[in-house]
Amino acid sequence: MTFGPRVHKSPFFDSTRRYGAKAFTVYNHVYMPTCYSSPLDEYWSLVNDVTLWDVTCERQIEITGPDAFRFIQMLTPRDMSKCQVGQCQYMVLTNQDGGIVNDAVLLRVGEDQYWLSPGDGDVLMWASGVAVNSGMDVEVFEPDVSPLQLQGPKAPYVARDLFGDWAVEMKYYWLKETTLDGIPLVVSRTGWSGELGYEIYLRDHRFGDQLWERVMQAGKPYNIAPAAPNTIRSIEGGMLSYVSDITLQD
């Protein structure tokens, strides 16, 4: 693949190259690593140990303002009224005919502050267009947020060593704002692996290399390996991927 300026490089791009990424695809207009060793080797690392993924391609969409909740609810048929601050929920985004525009994980970061973590597709453009004619007081924009996924049965040990016991005790689909060595983060008990895992949302792209290296060093005692989202494990786990398994016609 030829790298060019029309596609975004993640804050972890240089780190992934140093750690052996040898193939990339374009996902949400971002280069995403698809292979370091082999899909099979990465599968066994995922199910036996722990892996670190660069998933900056999950380009976050922030929705804020007094009408943020009402706007979120307009985008999905799922009842979001029970989503508390600090909680995440899976949701499908639908158009006026009920067609699935995308699927996403919603993170409620604050009382009137939400992040959408979508699959592949121009969700930011779509949501911005919906907001224009909604009559609601909301802002829709892309924040400076870049996620990593820490996935595998040993992920809780790495998270504990990085953040403390609260990371092990965190409930599934909940989040916490925190810092690591002064780096601003949001950590959630979510992932796309069918294994135990976390997503670590970097809130300042300047710390990409530093955060990647910090997590990899913490994972050494647990045989951590860099990896790509694993199709084998996603099929085993029954997890759907937008475009591959879900389309606007569904």
Where are these regions (language model features)?
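Acidic, proline/glycine-enriched N-terminal capping motif
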Residues: 1-91, 99
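Conserved, structured C-terminal
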Residues: 1-34, 107-250
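Short amphipathic beta-strand starts and helix->beta connectors
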Residues: 39-48, 93-103, 132-135, 179-187
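Short secondary-structure transition/capping motifs
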Residues: 60-64, 95, 105, 112-119
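Internal amphipathic helical hairpin motif
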Residues: 66-100, 154-183
